[in-house]
Curated annotation (Swiss-Prot):
It comes from Prosthecochloris aestuarii (strain DSM 271 / SK 413). Converts the free carboxyl group of a malonyl-thioester to its methyl ester by transfer of a methyl group from S-adenosyl-L-methionine (SAM). It allows to synthesize pimeloyl-ACP via the fatty acid synthetic pathway. Coiled coil: none annotated. Pathway: Cofactor biosynthesis; biotin biosynthesis. Keywords: Biotin biosynthesis, Methyltransferase, S-adenosyl-L-methionine, Transferase. The keyword RNA-binding does not apply. This is Malonyl-[acyl-carrier protein] O-methyltransferase. InterPro entries: BioC, Methyltransf_11, SAM-dependent_MTases_sf.
Length: 268
């Protein structure tokens, strides 16, 4: 499986950030679906304090603010250029107070506390200690607060994995529920598979590149390796007049249990 290189992740996302939403149509669909789940889990559309982790191009920010009125919006990302994206979107929606926290969420010494909602769109697959993340977020949430996130499943980009033997390790819904343990109760868990059709393997590679971080490793793409990949992809994954690429999307919505009120986190 692919080893996480967060410096490389930051560089690749940073290079593609401003054109991301034009190509990341699955991620945009995920943002809308996750925002719907969050909205459905809340008793009111009025939210006091919300923290978004992995804000990226602010597609989820925009989707949430179309559904909720949020008094205090905190956002975090590994890529510092995301600050401008989230500030633009929150200003357009009239958010009075927004704050951006730059850096790796697993390395930040302080995070916001007394939160009503924590959300994360297509980010937790990059975390190295998911159980630790769940525990720390429970410490930052109010009792009854919501932790909701989208991620990907084991069939995600299975075509790339089959040909290159690289890719992230994805957890199942059951595994993530077990990691959350007794800190949370589940209010919703869903998964979907999407097959995208492309004109050819070259178009698949362009799509993956333009969505920032791809499922391929950092090895150099020589002409011979590129040609072999194109030929193998076309033979193995033809679909109609082109080729296919699979996305396996997953959604979790947890509510902090009152019994976990004593969990602590380093909060600002």
């Amino acid at each position: 499986m692919q080893q996480l290189n967060k410096t490389l992740i930051r560089q690749r996302f940073g290079r593609q950030l401003h054109g991301y939403n034009r190509h990341a149509f699955i991620q945009k669909k995920m943002a809308g679906h996750l925002a719907d789940m969050v909205s459905a889990s809340l008793a009111s559309s009025e939210v006091g304090r919300l923290f978004e982790i992995g804000v990226g191009s602010a597609a989820l920010t925009d989707a949430l603010l179309h559904r909720l009125r949020i008094d205090r919006y905190y956002a975090n990302d590994l890529v510092p250029q995301c600050r401008q994206m989230v500030e633009t979107v929150t200003a357009l929606h009239g958010v009075d107070s927004a704050e951006f926290l730059d850096g790796d969420i697993e390395a930040l010494r302080e995070i916001p506390g007394d939160l009503d909602v924590i959300v994360s769109g297509a980010t937790v697959q990059w975390l190295e200690d998911l159980p630790g993340f769940f525990h720390r977020m429970a410490g930052a949430l109010k009792p009854g607060g919501v932790l909701a996130f989208s991620t990907f499943g084991h069939d995600n980009m299975q075509e790339i994995r089959a040909l290159e033997s690289v890719g992230l390790h994805y957890h199942t819904l059951a595994e993530m529920q077990a990691m959350a343990g007794e800190l949370y109760e589940v209010t919703g868990m869903e998964e979907e598979r999407h097959q995208l059709d492309f004109t050819g393997p070259e178009a698949v590679l362009r799509h993956i590149s333009r969505t920032g971080v791809n499922g391929l490793d950092g090895r150099a793409w020589t002409k011979s390796r590129h040609r072999a990949f194109i030929d193998r992809y076309r033979r193995a994954f033809s679909s109609g007049d082109g080729v296919r690429l699979t996305y396996h999307t997953m959604y979790c919505c947890f509510r902090k249990c009152p019994a976990s009120a004593g969990v602590e986190a380093t909060c600002c």
